[in-house]
Each structure stands twice: as structure tokens, then as C-alpha cells.
Design a protein with these regions (language model features):
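A glycine-rich helix N-cap at a beta->alpha junction
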Residues: 87-97, 163-177, 370-382
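Non-catalytic terminal/interface segments that mediate subunit docking, oligomerization
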Residues: 64, 250-359, 364-374, 473-475
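Glycine/charged-rich beta-loop-alpha catalytic/anionic-binding loops adjacent to active sites
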Residues: 29-36, 96-113, 135-141, 314-328, ...
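Glycine-rich ThDP/TPP pyrophosphate-binding loop and its adjacent helix/strand module
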Residues: 110-267, 272-279, 283-288, 408-518
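Peripheral docking tails and interdomain loops at the edges
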Residues: 265, 273-278, 387-389, 409, ...
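Cofactor-binding active-site loop characterized by glycine-rich and histidine/acidic residues
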Residues: 41-164, 300, 305, 314-315
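Acidic, glycine-rich active-site loops and adjacent beta-strand->loop/helix elements
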Residues: 70-75, 144-151, 172-178, 218-219, ...
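Cofactor-/ligand-binding subdomain signature composed of acidic, glycine-rich
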Residues: 1-34, 252-268
């Protein structure tokens, strides 16, 4: 097997075309081996195998610089740069390899940590400018595809690459897909270019000042080598547009490209997946609820940004929603400004977004939404410790971010019933933008009545009255708060338990009511505590006699963390919290 022996891409240059085709086949099988056992991005990587072999054959990496957008296509690159053991080896060897570009893992060949979309061209222009100033001669190659061209930063990067006017190669990996179907006018032009074999008159890339090459056979190693050779050492901004097949070589991924964009472990022989217990999910509950409400309210519009799965909108549900579902492509900034405009125009927009991606929208939320006080709704999902754990995808920063923006209410429901009650109120009210942090610790139900109306000022809910100690447990950490209260009761301490519901500001009345009867307040939040919910409460009590123990995650860039270890390191295991409470009281 070639790939077991290849330690660097330079070894590919000794092989003939037939051997390179074997390398491509072996690489595809290695990728399949990893994702079938470990999970990961399936379709995007399988479709870019031949292109990766050709890129490393033609160009002289690591002198020549490769930048992969979003890293969804970087697995074959890892196989060919000395990391095949992470695809062929045991579980520990697989765990050692990130699912994304990682200079920590391989500084020689991975130039950047990349996991969010539309950044490759911008990053590459920085390398381009550095090369030009230093007077060196290396090729700079950015790889972009899988819907990333719908993101605003991709446009900004292309604009700058054209402005610089020196050699840069942008490989547009056109597999006709994003995560789901692509959205945006650029994809109409890509379709026209495909259908005309790159010859149509209205060429978006040429209009921006790029040299342009088109290759229909984007999964043909020999033809890829030919087109890459033709642009090597160019001194002009150049686009190489290759038409590939997402999931190439694995029929289940070809037949259902959206479902196989990313996959958990599966049987690589037939694509079957292990049966898992059927459990409720907020994605399914939300999409069903929205579709039902849409039938009664034609002004209700569900918005997604390239990830319709965040709101549970399968292809069938997107079809059912029709014009009442809008996917803006991988363009979160556009989503925020658009929902503000929708609300201004009399619609009731609900945008659902993964916590890790809302980080891209700070300015739009502050400027376009909150200053204008337009009553749009933002669902923030997968926020917290129990979500994604790669360094580029950690979901710990939405609370400090959103709570720093004036004019935005950020709600944290603790149960399914409370969530949908908050959602209904947020949709029907017409005064302010409302964000809601969907619980990330599973779907919990309550038989108790939940409020149907919510104030625009924070109003906490005391769910159990006690003394000496008050536990204020927000959102998906509320059940942790219940556990802590129970454990304290076993030690003779009857604690007060509070569901704060509001993350963006403190409820002064409730906090003042604790003075005199309580010595300690413990705050629990499922995210970064620096600048978060608990620190606001600590600041409020600053001049009082009440002590505050702020429970949350220390600010850091965590990578592939173990959940229980992360909680333990931050003194957030139930027993640790109880120990700390007793120590402080004593």
C-alpha cells in the first residue's frame, strides 16, 4: 500500500499516472475507514481525493502554501502528509488527528486552524502579501467549495486577491452542493459555467479580474494534473474551477449528498448505521412546531444560514414550508440583517443558528438588529459544554457575546415546555429582538405550569426556597442545580434554587431578597464564565456581605476536550460544587 509508506507529498512525484490513481483509491479507502469508525465529514472529503493527489503532485508543498476552506476537504491532504495512521490505525491514532486543518498537529503542511467557512481566500491573501513583500516565489493556493462562496468573507477575499494583482491560485471545488443545496446568485453562475464547459459570457470570476480555467472532470487525476500544471507559478490572480462529485466513490454518499455531508460511524460496506434509541430532539420538535404555526400565520418565516439541520428542516420539511423557509447560504451576517428587515417589514422571522456560528454576527446583531429594535427572534442551539468540542467549533462564548449587546434579551429555558412558551411569546411580542438559548442537555419536560408572558426586564423564578445558600442555575445547567440542591439537602443544607430565565441582565428584586437570609450565592452557567451571566451577579453583590461562587468554564481555546474532564477541571461536577459550598460556608 503506497499511502502507508508516504511520509511527505514529495514522494508522489516519483510515481506515474497509474500509480497516482492507485494512491487516490487507497486514500479514498483510508478516508472511508476513518469516518466509518470515527465519524466525520464524508461527502466533501471523498469528492476531493483526486484533486488533493494532483495538487501535491504538481505543487511543491510545504514551500508552496495550501489553505483549505472550512477544512471539510482536508482529510486526503492529511493522509498524504504523514498522517495516514490517523486513518488506518487504531482508535487512539484516529483520536490524535483532528477533523480540521491544524498546525498544532502538523505545522509544516497545515498553515491555519480552520473550521468556519469562507475564510481560505482571505487567509491566502495574507500569505500572498507576505510573499510579495519578502520577494519569495512560492505558489499560494486557496481551496474553497461546499457552499463557502456564499459567505461574505469569501467575496472580500476575492476582492482583495484581485486588487493585489499578483500570483494566487483559487481552486473552486464545485460539487453542486453546500451542506444541503447551495443558495445565492453565485451558484447560478457556477451552474451556467458548468453547463457551458466554462465558456459562458457572464463569468463572475473574469468580471472580478481573475484568469479562469474550467475542468469538467474534477475527479480525474490526470486531467487535474494537467490543469494545475498550466497555472503553476502564475503571476496573476487565477481561478481553477473544477467540477467534482460530492461523495465520489461511495454510492450512499453520492445518492444522498446532504445526509452524508457529515456522518457518525457506519458500515462502510453498505452505508448502514447502527440503530440508536429514538429520542426526542429540539431540532425535530422545533421544525414540527414551526410548520404547524406557519399554517396559521403566513407572516412566520423560519430562517437558516446553510445549516437547515439546526432547525430540523429536512428536505421534506423545507418543501412543506415553501416560501416561509429561507436559507441564506453560509452567510450568518446576511441572516441577521435580513431578519431585522423582515421584522421591520411586518414578518415574524425566527433564525436558528448553532452557537459556534453566531460569533460571526456581533456587529450585525448590535447595529442592524438591536439599535433598530426590530422584533426578530434568534434561536441559539448547541450552546454549551455538551456540544461540539473541536477548537474551531466550541460553543462556549455565546452568553458573554450576546449579553454584552444592549437592547437584546437573551432567554435560557430549562425545559421543553418553557422553551416553546418563550418562543411563542418572543414571536408575538413587537418591542425588541429576543434570543433564546435552546437547552443542549437533552429534552427535559415539566408537569408544572410555565409562564406564557415574559417581561422586558429580568424576572427570575424561585423554584425552591431555602436559606444560607442560593443556587442560580441557568438554562441547560438548571438540572445540575437541582442535583446540587438535592445533595446539599442530604448534608442538612436546604438551599434556595432559582431559574433565572434571563441571561442578559440581573433581577435586582430577587437578588436583594436573598440578602439577610443567605450567605452564599452560587451561579451555574453552561459556557465561558468570563464576561458571562454569573459575573454580572457577582458584580451586583460586590459591596454586600454575600459571597458569590461563579460556576462556569474558564476562558480558553479548548480542543477535542473530554466533557467530564472539562467539568472536573472547572469544578463543575455536582459533588465538587457541593464540596466548594461547604468549604465556603465553613
Amino acid at each position: 500500500m503506497y499511502i502507508e509508506k508516504i511520509k511527505s507529498p514529495t514522494e508522489l512525484k516519483q510515481l506515474n499516472i497509474e500509480a497516482l490513481k492507485v494512491v487516490a483509491d487507497e486514500t479514498r479507502q483510508a478516508v472511508l475507514n476513518r469516518v466509518s469508525k470515527h465519524g466525520g465529514h464524508v461527502g466533501p472529503n471523498l469528492g476531493f481525493v483526486e484533486a488533493t493527489v494532483a495538487l501535491h503532485y504538481v505543487f511543491d508543498t510545504p514551500k508552496d502554501k495550501l489553505v483549505f476552506d472550512v477544512s471539510h476537504q482536508s482529510y486526503p491532504h492529511k493522509v498524504l502528509t504523514g498522517r495516514a495512521s490517523g486513518f488506518l490505525g487504531n482508535v487512539d491514532e484516529m483520536n490524535a488527528i483532528s477533523g480540521y486543518s491544524s498546525p498544532t498537529e502538523c505545522p509544516e503542511y497545515d498553515n491555519f486552524e480552520v473550521g468556519h467557512t469562507s475564510t481560505s481566500v482571505s487567509l491566502a491573501t495574507g500569505l500572498q502579501k507576505a510573499r510579495d513583500i519578502k520577494g519569495t516565489k512560492e505558489n499560494i493556493i486557496a481551496v474553497i467549495g461546499d457552499g463557502s462562496l456564499s459567505g461574505g468573507e469569501a467575496f472580500e477575499g476575492l476582492d482583495e486577491a484581485s486588487e493585489l494583482g499578483t500570483g494566487i491560485i483559487i481552486v473552486v471545488n464545485d460539487n453542486e452542493m453546500s451542506i444541503a443545496e447551495p443558495h445565492g446568485g453565485i451558484y447560478k453562475n457556477l451552474r451556467d459555467l458548468r453547463e457551458s464547459n466554462g465558456q459562458c459570457n457572464h463569468n463572475w470570476f473574469k468580471a472580478w479580474g481573475f484568469e479562469y480555467k474550467y475542468l469538467e472532470e474534477g475527479n480525474d487525476v490526470e486531467k487535474l494534473i494537467e490543469v494545475f500544471r498550466s497555472v503553476k507559478d502564475t503571476n496573476k490572480p487565477t481561478v481553477v474551477h473544477i467540477h467534482t462529485e460530492k461523495g465520489h466513490g461511495f454510492s450512499p454518499a453520492v445518492e444522498n449528498k446532504e445526509a452524508w455531508h457529515y456522518g457518525m460511524p457506519f458500515n462502510k460496506e453498505d452505508g448502514s448505521r447502527p440503530e440508536r434509541p429514538t429520542t426526542e430532539s429540539y431540532e425535530q420538535l422545533l421544525s414540527d412546531w414551526l410548520l404547524k404555526e406557519m399554517k396559521q400565520d403566513k407572516t412566520l418565516v423560519a430562517v437558516t444560514a446553510g445549516t437547515p439541520s439546526a432547525a430540523g428542516f429536512t428536505p421534506e420539511k423545507r418543501k412543506e414550508a415553501g416560501a416561509q423557509h429561507v436559507d441564506v447560504g453560509i452567510a450568518e451576517e446576511q441572516a441577521v440583517a435580513m431578519i431585522s428587515g423582515m421584522a421591520k417589514g411586518g414578518l415574524r422571522p425566527v433564525w436558528t443558528v448553532f452557537s459556534t456560528f453566531i460569533q460571526r454576527t456581533y456587529d450585525q446583531i448590535a447595529q442592524d438588529l438591536c439599535i433598530n429594535a426590530n422584533p426578530a427572534v434568534i434561536n441559539v442551539t448547541w450552546g454549551g459544554t455538551a456540544s461540539m468540542n473541536d477548537i474551531t467549533h466550541i460553543c462556549l462564548f455565546d452568553i458573554p457575546m450576546l449579553c454584552s449587546i444592549p437592547g437584546l434579551i437573551y432567554l435560557a429555558p430549562t425545559t421543553c415546555e418553557e422553551y416553546f412558551s418563550m418562543l411563542r411569546w418572543a414571536i408575538l411580542q413587537d418591542k425588541k429582538p429576543i434570543a433564546i438559548r435552546i437547552p443542549s442537555n437533552g429534552v427535559h419536560h415539566t408537569t408544572e405550569n410555565v409562564d406564557t408572558e415574559y417581561a422586558y426586564e429580568a424576572k427570575y423564578k424561585v423554584t425552591q426556597k431555602g436559606e444560607k445558600v442560593a443556587i442560580i442555575a441557568a438554562g441547560s445547567f438548571y438540572q445540575k442545580g437541582e442535583n446540587v440542591v438535592r445533595l446539599l439537602a442530604e448534608k442538612g443544607i436546604k438551599a434556595t434554587l432559582i431559574n433565572p430565565r434571563y441571561l442578559n441582565e440581573v433581577d435586582r428584586e430577587t437578588l436583594d431578597s436573598l440578602k439577610g437570609s443567605h450567605k452564599l450565592v452560587v451561579t451555574l452557567e453552561d459556557g465561558s464564565k468570563d464576561g458571562g451571566f454569573g459575573e454580572r451577579i457577582a458584580a451586583y453583590y460586590g459591596t454586600s456581605e454575600i459571597k458569590v461562587l461563579v460556576g462556569g468554564i474558564k476562558k480558553d481555546l479548548y480542543d477535542r476536550f473530554d466533557l467530564q474532564q472539562l467539568l472536573s477541571d472547572n469544578r463543575l461536577l455536582d459533588e465538587q460544587i457541593v464540596e466548594d459550598v461547604i468549604d465556603i460556608l465553613s
